[in-house]
Amino acid sequence: MRGLVNKLVSRSLSISGKWQNQQLRRLNIHEYQGAELMGKYGVNVPKGVAASSLEEVKKAIQDVFPNESELVVKSQILAGGRGLGTFKSGLKGGVHIVKRDEAEEIAGKMLGQVLVTKQTGPQGKVVSKVYLCEKLSLVNEMYFSIILDRKSAGPLIIACKKGGTSIEDLAEKFPDMIIKVPIDVFAGITDEDAAKVVDGLAPKAADRKDSIEQVKKLYELFRKTDCTMLEINPLAETSTNQLVAADAKLNFDDNAAFRQKEVFAMRDPTQEDPREVAAAKVDLNYIGLDGEIGCMVNGAGLAMATMDIIKLHGGTPANFLDVGGNASEHQVVEAFKILTSDDKVKAILVNIFGGIMKCDVIASGIVNAAKEVALKVPVVVRLEGTNVEQGKRILKESGMKLITADDLDDAAEKAVKALAH
């Protein structure tokens, strides 16, 4: 789903695609949590309940869905593509529509199992909860999202007359179906703004006035909870003439954690990369990748340039790691611990251009890290800038077997060569 958003706004982003997403840590919550939150803001959502055990599943079926003939059982992981995913146990699909008396059985096949989707990577994610929902009778499926758009310097509503799993393809084949409505961040959403969205979607059955109110409520949720992205796919029309958020994905700005206590209490660290969780605890910007060369760099731009040059020389970066401009020795030590905890890392490249960040602090951190962590892989170090001579002296006097480099190109080349030794 997120692919469409990236494609539609790529012109307004200085960095598009995957790397853009890596510059901000964003809270991602489960579908059932998003539905609960939307319900509090008056957004129409399907009746549903989350369960983490077969006992809870059985109770929910009896208490919440006593008269339903069919239910939707949805695995809850923080990744897209669940419907087309495969469990390592062999079960196909992380979303199933089943008869009421089959719901407990299918939930049992999901709970505690690892689901692999196009977004999880081959390792997959463990399903700790399932979401039981009423099966809606849908007459139309559409797409709706709100994002933060740099070009318009504010929220942007993106909608499409057609929804579902093929939204990216539809955006390419039928660009005239895409509706984009920028919202004035100071004035907020107006009736006219909401009407543009609804008239563009042209609902077949849902009441126009009610639909306008639903769009306004979705925007209020986006604004009041510090969302960075709200995506509903599908935004569905039911046989009862209602507009319903049938499936939603919400991300929130981590910088708002101090004032969004209720929202951030929903965080599920068990679904996050443990390395990213550890990095966040010490204020490091870290994103795990699948390569072999661990990177520690100061500055997001330099970090991305470092990864690009590693690729240019035939290597693959194992991570994005920006220690920032004011890192302490402790943070450098913790950064090394995170890098060395990745079994795929066969070499480490430290690339520091000291401005506010001092090279001697980095050097001391490297030496202290070596005392706490058994460095079993070659380490390539390129230092330049503030206190560079002090930094080089600290490294030399440490007696560590380091590979030094004169510039970034040299450092990347040496890191790639070090993989062969």
From Swiss-Prot:
Residues reported to bind substrate: 298, 355-357
Residues that coordinate or bind Mg(2+): 233, 247
Binding site for ATP: 74, 81-83, 141
Gene Ontology biological process terms from the UniProt entry: tricarboxylic acid cycle
Keyword Transmembrane: no
InterPro entries linked to this entry: ATP-grasp, ATP-grasp_succ-CoA_synth-type, ATP_grasp_subdomain_1, Succ-CoA_synthase_bsu_CS, SUCC_ACL_C, Succ_CoA_ligase-like_bsu, Succinyl-CoA_synth-like
Keyword Endoplasmic reticulum: no
Domain ATP-grasp: 35-278
Record-listed E.C. numbers: 6.2.1.5
Signal peptide: none
Subcellular location(s) of the protein: Mitochondrion
Catalytic activity: succinate + ATP + CoA = succinyl-CoA + ADP + phosphate
Residue runs in coiled coils: none
MF terms (GO), sorted A to Z: ATP binding; copper ion binding; magnesium ion binding; succinate-CoA ligase (ADP-forming) activity
Involved pathway(s): Carbohydrate metabolism; tricarboxylic acid cycle; succinate from succinyl-CoA (ligase route): step 1/1
Cofactor or coenzyme needed: Mg(2+)
One matching Pfam family: ATP-grasp_2
This protein's GO CC annotations: mitochondrion
Transit peptide: 1-26
NCBIfam families: PRK00696.1 (NF001913), sucCoAbeta (TIGR01016)
Biological role: Succinyl-CoA synthetase functions in the citric acid cycle (TCA), coupling the hydrolysis of succinyl-CoA to the synthesis of ATP and thus represents the only step of substrate-level phosphorylation in the TCA. The beta subunit provides nucleotide specificity of the enzyme and binds the substrate succinate, while the binding sites for coenzyme A and phosphate are found in the alpha subunit.
Self-association and partners: Heterodimer of an alpha and a beta subunit.
Family note: Belongs to the succinate/malate CoA ligase beta subunit family.
Record-given protein name: Succinate--CoA ligase [ADP-forming] subunit beta, mitochondrial
Organism for this UniProt entry: Arabidopsis thaliana
